Amino acid sequence: MTSAPIAQQRLLIDLQDIDSRLARLRHERKHLPVLGRIESVIERLKTNKRAAIQADAALSEAKTRVTRSEDEVGQVVRRAEALRERLHSGNSAARDLSAIQGEIDQLGQRQSALEEAQIAAMEALDSAREESERLKQEESDIRVAGRELTAKRDAEFARLDQEIDSLEKQRADLAGTVETALLSDYEAVRASTGGLGAVALRGRTVEGGAVEISPQELARIVAAPQDQVIHAEENDVIIVRMDI
């Protein structure tokens, strides 16, 4: 059973206060609201990237369709011009003139259909370009928002890290004044409970943690020697008497 002067035991309450504050600060650092917002920005950027890949593919396909439609129209126009030259050259036999004119008429119909398809392809190209540009602008906006949030996160980290560093130094100084055996006892309890090592007992009231003591246990504590380090029956937390 560990024993230590009551003054030494009371240092554990100050140490616990620092440890509790450190735990709160570390929890705050890990769960800053800005971190969730940054994650949302990252997801938006991923979604934008996927959409941009699809948009670029659609733009490339639209360009190919426009080029193909232009080539098809050009071929029909050149063929029709060649036939008109034959028709008006006077070198064709009379029996061929009707066939030439018929093919010219068919090419005219074909040209009209191809030109309509060309217009549709150009409209699709314009839409694909607009979507690609929209996604590029969206990406830029997302990155701007990301940089702003990152700057805010870094500022919050710097503030919290400064507080944590200051408290860690205070803790090191204070821990250095606690007897080795008592400090080891405290640290072991903290490790087993997940952070709570010591609580203060003032009269019949336990302060600083969820520790309940029965009347029988209270009587045992009151009767214990002053330098005896007392552990709660419930969870082994060190109970420091503040009124003796």
Task: Give, region by region, the residue ranges found by the protein language model.
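Short, charge-rich amphipathic alpha-helices with coiled-coil/heptad character
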Residues: 1-5, 20-60, 86, 133-147
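Extended, amphipathic alpha-helical coiled-coil scaffold segments used for oligomerization/tethering
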Residues: 49, 72-112
